[in-house]
Amino acid sequence: MPTLVVLAVLLAGLVVFANVWTDVQWYSQLKAAKVFWTQWGWAIALGTLGTLLVGLSAFVNHIVARTGEKTAVRKGIDQYRQQIEAHPWLARLFVPLALGIVFGAQLGSQWRTYVLWLHRTPFGQKDAEFGNDVSFYVFTLPVLQSLLALSVTLLAVGAVVAIVSHYLYGGISSDGSKVVLTSRVRVHFGVLGALAALVVAGFLWLRRYNMLLANNEKFSGASFTDINASLPGITILSLAAVLIAGLFVLAAVKGLWKFTVIGIAVTAVAGLVVTTAIPYFVQRFQVVPNAAEKESTFIQRNINATLAAYGLDNVKKSEYKAQTDAAAGQLRSDAETTAQLRVLDPNIISPTFTQLQRNRPYYSFDQQLSVDRYTIKGTPRDTVISVRELNLNGLSEGQRTWVNDHTVYTHGFGVVSAYGNTTTSDGEPSFFQQGIPSTGELGKYEPRVYFGKSSPDYSVVGAPKGTTPWELDYPTGGSKNGVKSTTYAGDGGPKIGNAFSKLMFAIKFRDTDLFFSDRVTKDSQILYDRDPRVRVSKVAPYLTLDSRVYPAVVDMDGNPKTPKRLVWILDGYTTTNQYPYSARQSLNEATADAKSKGAGQYGESPEQVNYIRNSVKAVVDAYDGSVKLYQWDKKDPIVNAWSKVFPGTLTPMSKMSGDLMSHMRYPEDMFKVQRTLLSRYHVTNAKEFYSGGDFWDVPQEPTAPKGSTQDQPPYYLTLQMPGQDKAQFSLSTGFILGGADKQNVMTGFLAVDSEAGSEPGKVRNGYGQLRLIELPRDVTVPGPGQAENNFLTDSKVSTTLNLLKQGGTQVIMGNLLTLPIGGGLLYVQPVYVQASKTSGSTSYPIAQYVLTTFGKGSKIGFAPTLEESLNQTFGGDSGAQAGDANVSGHKEAPSADSNKQQAESESQCFAEPERLSFGFA
């Protein structure tokens, strides 16, 4: 049995060593070893310190008790004392060390708290009550709380050891009717009591500051009752606890325990009065009858702090007197916006990309494609883009061997991108970059995708020079076996060429084939942790990552002679929940909508935050997996502190190429959090805020299934907001009336300038500017839900769509876009049709119609193109040209006379392929 235990311990140690050693290799390959060693160095150092302090507390209290008076021999007790004396190392070393490990080592898990405090930087903003810089609450207060919690552990462990030791050595005894303590024991306990009282005083003193971080029913931060009733009482109690500490010392020296007991009793009763009774009466009889007036000062503090903490203190607000009548030529001044109006829905057309561009079953595209912009032939264009990633699930069961999974099928290939504002005449995406090999308007770039969101868990790549390539590169008709092979030539993973490395990685992945396979050569590398989010979160463990990762083909070095790179771009946030008076918000709740499908943030983040900054833009190369962290926010004190903790890991934004800069955008999750807060905090008057009468809601997704309460997602598109000089790539959302009734009436519209510019190392002026337009209360402007209802209840639209459905065709309503143009609000929605799923894998959605409406009294536009639909809505001529103006559909737009006949024709058109497909099957 002992042999088995030893073997088990050795095996466990080997596994731990293998995991640590391989992690070191991974970080070293990324030139980020300092991140690994800094994390573990601080964690081990603090864990060791906590262990030693707790162990020392146990040791000192035992020694103090041991040197006390010894009583006469007590049957049944002295035998234990004799055992301890016979093995002094047990009590003096082993027990304290064991207690230290159990209760003290956890201090290592708080390494972030301590390193941030050591490298803290000021916020330059003071709290409204005590005048402390915000950095005190973010960096210092957590350390003080941690130290007090550690003190409680030290005293608790010390007290338990003291009681046990005094009992064993006779300092504590019983004569049958009462417990007898020697004078030395009373002194010992008096000192411990004094220290405990000081710790309580410390907790009470810090509680004063924690009031500013509290959540109240109506707002966050300290309230009138907190400041005027609870705060004075807690301050008095804290001072009283210091006096009690003095009484404990007096009792220890003079033996006057009566005064100590009286002091504790009086303080306990006073504590109930000043922390419970007085605040209750103040709240009930002073605040409740006059709440708006009494709380206004504190609500205003909450409003100001929340706007500052969430980057909402510079929102440009304006009133927008929206028209509801549409007239010919009304969009003439908005031609730039309508030209880029997106009719391709990135959340619907993934199956279309898959059917038309996948090429082989072992490739796949993301379920939600990305919206970006590229300059094509000198013209900026909104685009929809996705990466053709490797998907091993597309292989047959017979193809799923270790060799294939880990050495042959190693990477995806290229991007596919289509114009966002137009389609082909058949309703399919109009691709400008496509195919294998990748061809199109993006120029020459490295198309191989070794690092992506769906890459295999690990691949072994690389081979000696002259070896026949065995990695499948891409399918081609020009070779004997129909594929072109390649050998990885990058530096993307740790070397795995020698026996020791193979053994370590075989243990890590629990895979013996890694050790024995001949495909693992002296020139091999192992690629793992290939998801861009995983790589960034390991290199920057302090960041919360946006739920969206998007690809871009970018000139990284600014040299047009070198090939571009395919990269993944991620937005990183620094957050805290320690900003005084700022409202707390759950990131997962604020960012959940109909598009997120449960995807949340990745990385380090508290459950709720009350401060957030998009401090870092991360870029991961899809070929070699290299990670670059660009410091996007130079003023954020939290990221500045982390840059001192991990020096050299952040790249100044000034080193970003112009082409990469042009693909930076305002982060989606940040915007969602801000819109959630602005639904309430657009009200900046404290008394109006208290009433809540003008609070808004985010509209629910109008295309979601009945009964769903999912929020409508914000959308990236090019638009010109009222007061803006020209149309810019933006992220936008609407607001509707708040309250339990959920009236779908538009009350506001928020957009943020998401155009970072294309100047190397410099963000364009205007990027990140939030613009909020508020609609007049005396005009009823339909919200997204009303607009969707108007579309579906229009006789022409409903007849056509119902007939299509009867013919076996699935009708899919695309994203409902809202645009404040033409002096009102324009709604645009593409309509997709898809053959029934019973027709097999050839079923995919194509854009068939575009719906438009402007105000509650306007005509519904319903046509194969946006151009025609806008003209229908605006009296035959909208005055502007849409991006699909030159597209002619393969059937005419439905008219009042031909609507039924047209729909029946389309129904047959889609039903027949279904029958043919079934027949051939």
Describe the residue ranges of each PLM region.
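Soluble extracytoplasmic regions of secretory-pathway and membrane proteins
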Residues: 3-920
